[in-house]
């Protein structure tokens, strides 16, 4: 058996608690990404880079060292400290307690990876190289951002409205299928 592949899945986490342990650049990037999908993001660290000031009203900030009490009720945990031992401890705890965990400096402890993505309203395009080339993922994301610009948010909304109208108004299953696929 070769490399373990990640299963592509979209999770609805808007009401789920996401805890990020760490206050540096990686933690900040992870935090801003999760804020696009969850309203319950908690950051734990004694020290924070200045950028966290920009999002302090959108997240819960706990200025303290890591303690497992902070992640007991979390659905998703990101271990992004500058201490490999602490990240390892978080990863082990989460794996033993059935939590989704991403350990930024040890993928063997992670049970999920956050792909690069383009989000245009409900259109979500994910890009992953399985961790082999984050720079290629970033390049592909940049290319897709040019192709799928901000107008796609409205386009997807219009398609969704048309789909609902067809489902509501067209009783014949075969005719509905033809209209939905055209």
Predicted features along the sequence, with ranges:
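Hydrophobic, well-ordered beta-alpha structural blocks that scaffold small-molecule cofactor pockets
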Residues: 1-47, 52-54
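Residue-level detector of alpha-helix initiation sites
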Residues: 25-26, 85, 131
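Hydrophobic beta-strand scaffold residues
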Residues: 41, 61, 100-101
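Short loop/edge segments at beta-strand edges and connector loops
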Residues: 45, 62-65, 105
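Glycine-rich, highly charged phosphate/nucleotide-binding loops
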Residues: 56-72
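Short basic, glycine-rich beta-strand/loop surfaces that mediate nucleic-acid
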Residues: 75-81, 115-131
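ADP-ribose/adenylate-binding Rossmann-like module
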Residues: 76-80, 87-113
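An accessory alpha-helical subdomain
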Residues: 131-182
């Amino acid at each position: 058996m070769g490399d373990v592949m990640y299963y592509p899945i979209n999770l609805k986490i808007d009401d789920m608690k996401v805890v990020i342990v760490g206050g540096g650049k990686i933690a900040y990037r992870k935090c801003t990404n999760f804020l696009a999908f969850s309203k319950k993001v908690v950051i734990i660290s004694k020290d924070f880079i200045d950028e966290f000031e920009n999002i302090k009203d959108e997240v819960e900030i706990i200025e303290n060292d890591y303690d497992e009490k902070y992640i007991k009720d979390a659905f998703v945990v990101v271990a992004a400290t500058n201490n490999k031992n602490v990240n390892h401890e978080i990863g082990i705890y989460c794996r033993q307690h059935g939590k989704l965990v991403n350990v930024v400096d040890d993928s063997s402890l992670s049970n999920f990876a956050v792909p690069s993505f383009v989000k245009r309203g409900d259109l979500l395009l994910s890009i992953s190289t399985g961790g082999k080339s984050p720079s290629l993922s970033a390049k592909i994301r940049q290319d897709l951002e040019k192709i799928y610009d901000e107008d796609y948010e409205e386009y997807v909304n219009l398609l969704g409205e048309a789909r609902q109208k067809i489902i509501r108004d067209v009783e014949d299953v075969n005719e509905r299928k033809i209209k939905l696929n055209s």
